[in-house]
């Protein structure tokens, strides 16, 4: 996990914020792609189930941030020992999810620009 954070911080420009115990890196689609290639990174799509079903990044799990129990669901599905990579449609919901996860003690990589930017760089994925 530390190696991932050091690699990202040394190779690309990103926005770094600290909330609670965890750290958040907000990164471009290309850096996000490199990040999720690392073993142990937990990939989370925080959009609605319908949005997720319409297309998602392979390997992601869906935890809808708009539900009233996002934190509880994340706590049962995610391991704090590993970085969590989050994305939504445009980057707004994933920023909120990243803040919540950070406050819970997770280290988070967030896709700035969301799935929309991912599709521009890598095409639509179903």
Regions from the PLM with identified roles:
Residues 87:
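Short, surface-exposed ligand- or partner-binding patches at beta-edge/loop junctions that are enriched
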Residues 43-45:
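Structural scaffold elements adjacent to functional motifs in cytosolic proteins
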Residues 1-8:
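Sec-dependent bacterial lipoprotein signal peptides
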Residues 9-35, 41, 50-83, 92-126:
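Rhodanese-like catalytic fold shared by cysteine-dependent sulfurtransferases
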């Amino acid at each position: 996990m530390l190696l991932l954070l050091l690699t990202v911080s040394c190779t690309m420009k990103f926005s770094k914020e600290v909330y609670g115990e965890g750290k958040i890196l907000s990164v471009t689609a290309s850096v996000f792609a490199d990040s999720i290639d690392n073993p142990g990174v937990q990939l989370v799509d925080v959009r609605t189930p319908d949005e997720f079903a319409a297309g998602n990044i392979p390997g992601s799990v869906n935890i809808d941030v708009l539900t009233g129990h996002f934190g509880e669901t994340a706590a049962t599905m995610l391991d704090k020992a590993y970085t969590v990579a989050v994305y939504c449609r445009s980057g707004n919901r994933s920023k909120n999810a990243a803040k919540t996860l950070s406050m819970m003690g997770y280290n988070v990589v967030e896709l700035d620009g969301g799935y929309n930017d991912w599709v521009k760089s890598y095409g639509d994925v179903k």
